[in-house]
């Protein structure tokens, strides 16, 4: 194992036409690249092959966060256009946001949204502005009336009605994410029925995915990278389900990198404990996993923290080899793309 990992170690060549721009007609119609760590093999399947790999007493853990229409468009009092991406809701009328304008807004300046809503900028923390909504309505009211789904930057089109349903898991419950937990997008009701028939248990954690998930790693050395913070919750019910799974010799299967980060944040010395709060856990090769036994995930951007996490879990050489095979076999990449299972 290398002592000094570089961001460049996680680069790979991806033809732009392999970046999925739209979802498949069938949620569960995607392909599945399966990595067996014990045999060091890579095989090609359909997504229903995921259920085939699940065993009785396994625990499937998903992220129930709900994507909010977090992109707002407005104007300054001077008339200049402003784009606002809500990163985190702090209260009914207060939130943190990324703001794009011809000139960085000053503290105390106003942004007008659709004539009825006025936002005052009250603070700045690095790239984020603290904003207050001056209205009898809540921030969620504003977003659901005037916001747009914040599609990832690599999807080169404007969102449409189809995205409102498809850039959202069918089990989304807790509003607060600005990006979807994409591994869960493959699940439909038939998937859950099949898992239950296999004798698997299902439970949910919450991690509100922030825009930081799309930010590049700017440090050359991974040791110098600082992760963005995201809010998460692992309940006592989840911890109890994990304990029961262990007692019955089952496996904990994380559906997505967000679930992986939740469970590994909440687990110390192989014991999962309830936790609600911030996580900035950065998982890369050399990390010692305490909770998760298998990972279902999508394909991730070159040099991203998500690819680093997958390499930590699956093994660097094996995962990078699998990515090369995925490119050669024309898999669909990123949020609306195909899936990978590592067990």
Curated annotation (Swiss-Prot):
It comes from Coxiella burnetii (strain RSA 331 / Henzerling II). It is found in: Cytoplasm. GO terms for molecular function: S-adenosylmethionine:tRNA ribosyltransferase-isomerase activity. InterPro entries: QueA, QueA_dom1, QueA_dom2, QueA_sf. Gene3D superfamilies: QueA-like (3.40.1780.10). Transfers and isomerizes the ribose moiety from AdoMet to the 7-aminomethyl group of 7-deazaguanine (preQ1-tRNA) to give epoxyqueuosine (oQ-tRNA). Belongs to the QueA family. Monomer. GO terms for cellular component: cytoplasm. It catalyses: 7-aminomethyl-7-carbaguanosine(34) in tRNA + S-adenosyl-L-methionine = epoxyqueuosine(34) in tRNA + adenine + L-methionine + 2 H(+). Keywords: Cytoplasm, Queuosine biosynthesis, S-adenosyl-L-methionine, Transferase. Pathway: tRNA modification; tRNA-queuosine biosynthesis. Its EC number is 2.4.99.17. This is S-adenosylmethionine:tRNA ribosyltransferase-isomerase. Coiled coil: none annotated. Signal peptide: none annotated. One of its GO terms (biological process) is queuosine biosynthetic process. PANTHER family: S-ADENOSYLMETHIONINE:TRNA RIBOSYLTRANSFERASE-ISOMERASE. It is an enzyme of class 2 (transferase).
